A protein has these predicted regions:
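Active-site helix of classical SDR
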Residues: 76, 112, 120
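Alpha-helical segment proximal to the catalytic Tyr-Lys
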Residues: 81, 125-129, 183
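Short, small/polar-rich loop/turn modules that mediate ligand/substrate recognition or access, typified
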Residues: 128, 133, 185-187, 193
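Substrate-binding pocket helix/loop in short-chain dehydrogenase/reductase
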Residues: 38, 52-53, 60-65, 147, ...
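The beta1-alpha1 cofactor-binding region of Rossmann-like NAD(H)/NADP(H)-dependent oxidoreductases
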Residues: 13-25, 58, 168-169
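Active-site loop immediately N-terminal to the catalytic Tyr-X3-Lys motif
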Residues: 54, 101-107, 129-130, 162, ...
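Residue(s) in the substrate-gating loop at a strand-loop-helix junction
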Residues: 96
Length: 198
């Protein structure tokens, strides 16, 4: 898809929740691209392990926080040095309506995404002087594998536009935030949720 759009892409399989794998993957990429740096980072990893808090297992809590929050820390810290030294970078973190509103049965997911929003706002202030922007996109209910088991017809009644969003609509928001036109936007959370607010 990237090549069809005139860009280039590489697949780098690794587990974003494991710090050693993140370090190795980024080191390998940097070794193969000595003149380049990762100028745009979209922290898009996410999993859900929904359950009421009283029934939630330790693994359900830890796996969600490791994938949704710790991966942000591992990857962002690793690529940030080059962004700062080159004085240009774009970081977009995929948050969620759950991180803004909090949803029952998703205490783990809501906690991870809310923390990601806080980290976005804090880091944006740390790196703005070096022309690195840090923003978040908070999707609502988007038609993906992650939402296919949810009761869509019931949920659509709560969404003012009356439908689930499309992945392309989320991608458009991300595309704007990584563009030169968004250079004066940092520390923001853009909701893509069809008008579903708290």
């Amino acid at each position: 898809l990237a090549e069809e759009a005139g860009g280039q892409a590489e697949l780098m399989p690794f587990d974003v929740s494991v710090q050693a794998e993140v370090e190795a993957a980024v080191d390998n990429w940097q070794d193969a691209h000595k003149e380049d740096y990762i100028a745009v980072l979209v922290n898009n990893a996410g999993i859900r392990r929904d359950n009421l808090m009283i029934f939630m297992q330790d693994d359900d809590w830890n796996n969600v926080l490791n994938t949704n929050l710790n991966s942000f820390f591992f990857l962002t810290r690793r690529v940030l040095k080059n962004m700062l030294s080159k004085r240009w970078g774009r970081i977009v973190n995929m948050a969620s309506l759950s991180g803004i509103k909090g949803l029952p049965g998703q205490t783990n997911y809501s906690a991870a995404k809310a923390a990601l929003i806080g980290a976005t706002k804090a880091l944006a202030q740390e790196v703005a002087a070096r022309k690195v922007t840090v923003n978040a996109v908070a999707p609502g209910f988007i038609a993906t594998d992650m939402t296919k088991e949810l009761p869509e017809e019931e949920l659509k009644k709560m969404i003012p536009v009356g439908r689930f969003g499309k992945p392309e609509e989320v991608a458009s928001a991300v595309g704007f935030l990584v563009s030169d036109e968004a250079a004066y936007i940092t520390g923001e959370v853009i909701s893509v949720n069809g008008g579903l607010y708290t």
